[in-house]
Amino acid sequence: MYVIMVYDVNQRRINKVLNTARKYLEWIQNSVLEGEITEAKFEMLKREIEIIINEEEDSVIFYIMRTTKYSERQILGIEKNKREQIL
């Protein structure tokens, strides 16, 4: 499956969330990561993130796509992390 992760967390936890997510997904730009991931690894990622965040203050959103066949990425402005693979 293909996952896009978007997060808005307290500044004290940003680095922990980013470093954890980068073990599974590719950093795209500030607070956004994406990539192919197995369901098992996705569950591991969610468990690790749940341990880090404070659910009273922080927000993490996962967009899950079973296929990227019909998706397209359009970028306005600079691309923060240039990639070969297009969503």
Swiss-Prot record:
It comes from the Bacteria. GO terms for biological process: defense response to virus; maintenance of CRISPR repeat elements. GO terms for molecular function: metal ion binding; RNA endonuclease activity. Gene3D superfamilies: 3.30.70.240. Its cofactor is Mg(2+). Mg(2+) binds at D8. Keywords: Antiviral defense, Endonuclease, Hydrolase, Magnesium, Metal-binding, Nuclease. Its EC number is 3.1.-.-. It is an enzyme of class 3 (hydrolase). Homodimer, forms a heterotetramer with a Cas1 homodimer. CRISPR (clustered regularly interspaced short palindromic repeat), is an adaptive immune system that provides protection against mobile genetic elements (viruses, transposable elements and conjugative plasmids). CRISPR clusters contain sequences complementary to antecedent mobile elements and target invading nucleic acids. CRISPR clusters are transcribed and processed into CRISPR RNA (crRNA). Functions as a ssRNA-specific endoribonuclease. Involved in the integration of spacer DNA into the CRISPR cassette. Belongs to the CRISPR-associated endoribonuclease Cas2 protein family. This is CRISPR-associated endoribonuclease Cas2. It comes from Dictyoglomus turgidum (strain DSM 6724 / Z-1310).
